[in-house]
Amino acid sequence: MKILSPLTVCLAVLLSAGCADSLKSDYQPPEVKYPANWYQADAAEERMPFDWQAFNDPDLDGWLRQVMVRNNDVAGAVLRVYGARLEEERIGITNDPGLKGSLALDGKKQLNSSAHWTRGSVASINTSYELDLWGKIARQRDAKAWARFASEEDLRSARLTLLSNASNNYWRLGFINQQLSVLQQSIDYAKETLRLANARYAAGGASSLDVVDAQQGVLSQENRLAALKNERLQALNQQAVLLGTAPGSAIVEPKALPMGPLPQVSGKIPVNVLRHRPDISAKEWRVREALATVDVQRTAFYPAFSLTGSLGTSSSSLIAFLENPVGSVGANLTLPFLEWRERGMDVKIARNDYEQRVLEFKQELYKAMSSIEDALALRHQLLEQETLLREGLELAKKSERLNEVRYRQGAVRISFWLDAQEKRRQAELALYENRFNQLNNLAKIYMEFGGSASFP
């Protein structure tokens, strides 16, 4: 083993800094085109289209907090982040100076003589450290750091998706319970209509067909009620899945949809909105990780240079070792470029993986732009639809009243009145469905804009 002078070691360290920079690739974000209606915003400008607290629903906020704590998907994402941090720490430990020690004691005695026992000892301490001449270790650390950042963004994305799913479950239960309430009222109304039809038939003022039509109306509403009760049970089971528990223990069940003012959405879209989306950020960090991996494979062409040191002795007494140790410093040189074909293939494979991730990242950007535009367009459509549905509901109520009067006067058969009841009921349910869709659309918009650090 060759002994190194301090000057040689210093020169090696200086050489390491220069060579490492020359083999480090600079990350350049891929060029993308943004929609013409998106504007360039300042970094400090608020990017969220509305504040989540504008829903003004404490029960919803409490439900979301419970889900965030107990959901298994989020718990799994937390563990993956922890695993990525451990991988990053392991790279640092692996490349720290290694230290090994050994101590051996032995005794000898000739069996055919009366000589005393001869005791001996061998002790040594060895250390080794690989000089990062080409930046290989630094790029390995970078790759693990980028992977950890991507895992952290995956956690944010999991929480944001859970926010949307849990909100949808909450509003879905409210929507179902509201439909149940409407249908129960309709059943009571249909039974009253049947009673009236029976009375008119008994008095000779109506035919038996009116009675049959009224009976069919009652059965139809009761059948819908049974189907809705099953939907409610499914929604409650989904709630248990979100909470990571067994079905059968409902935590929150709104009796109706919130009918108060909804959050106002800003139609302005800043260009930097995509930078705050966790799914986009995770994709970009993985692109950077792949680029760092390319650099690691490129450095494999260059020789690895490690410093070694040892301290030890061999004597008939351990005390002698402690009093007179022998130390040495040396260097080991490995030449991986002798396997140049295999190394070249590793670089090409890493480069191919990097280019794939770049394309996936660009595609994810364009998909995100489209999703944002679709969500905002749907918001505009739902608002227009709400206005038309309210007008339609008023007309349906008016038609129902007129047909009831005409039936009581004997001007029309009961089927006209029953049809008018059904149209009024469908118009009322359509308006509630529009409110349900608006709530889900708002959660979708909130998620498409990347959420915020303060969401429940």
Labelled PLM ranges:
Residues 95-118, 128-157, 179, 281, ...:
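Small/polar (Gly/Ser/Thr/Ala-rich) solvent-exposed segments
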Residues 20-89, 258-287, 336-337, 365:
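Bacterial Sec-pathway N-terminal export signals of envelope proteins
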Residues 207, 226-274, 413, 440-456:
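Short, solvent-exposed, mixed-charge loop/turn linkers that connect secondary-structure elements
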Residues 64, 122-126, 170, 270, ...:
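Membrane-embedded beta-strand positions in outer-membrane beta-barrel channels/transporters
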Residues 16-18:
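C-terminal motif of bacterial Sec signal peptides marking the signal peptidase cleavage site
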Residues 60-62, 120-122, 168, 213, ...:
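Transmembrane beta-barrel architecture of outer-membrane proteins
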Residues 1-8:
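Bacterial N-terminal signal peptides that target proteins for export
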Residues 76-91, 158, 162-185, 189-199, ...:
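Amphipathic alpha-helical coiled-coil segments
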